[in-house]
Structure formats: structure tokens, C-alpha cells
Design a protein with these regions (language model features):
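Conserved small/polar residues in nucleotide/adenosyl-binding loops
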Residues: 167-174
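Hydrophobic core of transmembrane alpha-helices in multi-pass small-molecule transporters
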Residues: 104-118
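Glycine-rich segments within core transmembrane alpha-helices of 12-TM secondary carriers
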Residues: 137-154
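Residue-level signature of mid-helix packing/kink "hotspots" within the transmembrane helices
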Residues: 57-65, 152
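C-terminal ends and interior cores of transmembrane alpha-helices
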Residues: 86-99
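Helix-to-loop junctions at the C-terminal end of transmembrane segments
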Residues: 64-75
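Intracellular juxtamembrane helix-capping segments at the cytosolic ends
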Residues: 119-132
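Extracytoplasmic
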Residues: 13-14, 20-36, 44
Length: 177
């Protein structure tokens, strides 16, 4: 952490950005909202979809370890950017699923998205905490609050949007568009 007169002020900005970053990273835990529409749309059963969440948690943890190692070599900015890019690619691939390939769901959401979020999670947590040597508990609590609040905030938004996109998907499949 740089020692200068702006440090007391700038650290709160970094904490705010960190909380927002963790809010978006926490969307990983909204899997239960996505599970039912995927089962309905593609005919996948509960055990197949549960396996995806198991993979997601494994690769999220591995991504955290990998993110820590990459941050030492590439720096925190590049590691967070790489994590964000991986998560974005994973979400785009997941959104483009046509139901013909369950392994593609496992790869896109379970591996790519989770690894990217793991990269960002670990690096954001450790980087922002470095700005708060006197308030590590407050800092980590605020960051983890952002991660946990994601299911409430973004999960509720996703829950509201899924019926709209699902109706569009069904209309497109039946030739209504």
C-alpha cells in the first residue's frame, strides 16, 4: 500500500469499488434461480444440474488459488481483468446454450465462469484489505457482505428477468418470431 496523504481517503473508494465487485462476483450463488428454468427448458434433471453447482464450487476455489498465484506474477489489475473476462465469457457461453450439450453447461458455467469469479474474488479481497491494516475485520466484513448480498439483489433481478427471456426462448422455438 502506498504511503501518502491520499491513503485515508482513497481507501474508502477502493472499499466501495471492492464491495461492488464482490456484489457482481456473488451472482455465482444465484444458481438455484437458474436451475429450474434450465431443467424446464432443456429437460435436464436435478442431479445433472446439481453436478454443475458442485463443479462451480470446486472451480471457484481453484480459481481463488490460481488468482493469488497470478496476482504475484501479473499484478492485481491484470488478474482481476482476466477474472472478469473469464466470467463474462462463461456467462455468454451459458446464455447461448441450446440444451443439446450438458457438458457445455459444465464447461461454461461450472468451469469458465467459476474460475474467473474465483480469480477476482481472491484478488479483490486481499488487495482491498491491504488498504485497511487497522480495520481488517470491518473491511473483509463489508466485502463479504457485498458477495452475500448478490443473491438478494442480483438474484431477485435475475428471477424477475428469467420469465421474460424464457417466454422469448419458447416463442422463438415455436416459430412465433
Amino acid at each position: 500500500m502506498p504511503c501518502n496523504t491520499k491513503a485515508p481517503t482513497i481507501r474508502w473508494f477502493y472499499l466501495t469499488i471492492g464491495i461492488l465487485s464482490m456484489l457482481f462476483a456473488g451472482i455465482l450463488y444465484s444458481w438455484s434461480i437458474l436451475k429450474a428454468p434450465l431443467a424446464d427448458a432443456f429437460g435436464w434433471n436435478a442431479s445433472q444440474l446439481t453436478m454443475n453447482f458442485t463443479l462451480t464450487m470446486c472451480f471457484f476455489c481453484l480459481g481463488g488459488v490460481g488468482g493469488g498465484l497470478l496476482a504475484r506474477r501479473l499484478g492485481t489489475r491484470l488478474t482481476i481483468a482476466l477474472g472478469g473476462a473469464l466470467a463474462c465469457i462463461g456467462f455468454v457461453l451459458t446464455a447461448r446454450l441450446d440444451g443439446s450439450s450438458l457438458p457445455m453447461l459444465y464447461l461454461s458455467y461450472g468451469v469458465i465462469t467459476a474460475t474467473g469469479i474465483g480469480f477476482a474474488y481472491n484478488v479483490v479481497l486481499s488487495t482491498v484489505q491491504a488498504w485497511f491494516p487497522d480495520k481488517k475485520g470491518t473491511c473483509s466484513g463489508a466485502l463479504l457482505m457485498g458477495f452475500g448480498a448478490s443473491s438478494l439483489v442480483l438474484g431477485s433481478l435475475a428471477d424477475a428477468l428469467i420469465p421474460v427471456s424464457y417466454t422469448h426462448l419458447r416463442a422463438h422455438e415455436t416459430g412465433a418470431y
